[in-house]
């Protein structure tokens, strides 16, 4: 589990650190105390050159997982790797269900943070398949990144509701 919404992380920094970094430590400890052989941490594209607290905590989490390969050493076959991908289409808190809800409510316009704002997208099925393939390929210490498309939020809004207007609302904290 992770605290994954950028603006929520900015307003609740201690909870974000506790959840994302403390959670990573807990998973590593649990794996070391059991007979688990492989652990893949699910991360985010925002962990690469982070510009917000969410990305920074996920980068730290990634480093905890990767460095845990050194802690285990040759003591056992436990290996840690990371998968970083973008937004899962339709996931909780992402823009697709937000836009869908506004459209279903009969709203006349969709909020757009910035016309230049983009997101990387992956379907749930694609993300699961990529993680499973990463398990097969992992040796320990890798950061796997799928090649996935990006789309401007304004283009997504146009595709979902071509007749609705857009209202530029500005970037949220951390964006």
Report each predicted region and the residues it spans.
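SDR active-site strand-loop-helix element
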Residues: 1, 39-44, 83-85
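NAD(P)H-binding glycine-rich loop region in Rossmannoid oxidoreductase-like domains
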Residues: 1-18
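Conserved catalytic-site region of short-chain dehydrogenase/reductase
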Residues: 33, 45-50, 88-90
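A short helix->loop->beta-strand "cap" motif at the edges of active sites that frequently abuts
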Residues: 34-38, 76-78
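NAD(P)-dependent short-chain dehydrogenase/reductase
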Residues: 53-54, 59-138, 149-153, 157-163
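Terminal hydrophobic/aromatic helix or amphipathic segment near a protein terminus
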Residues: 164-175
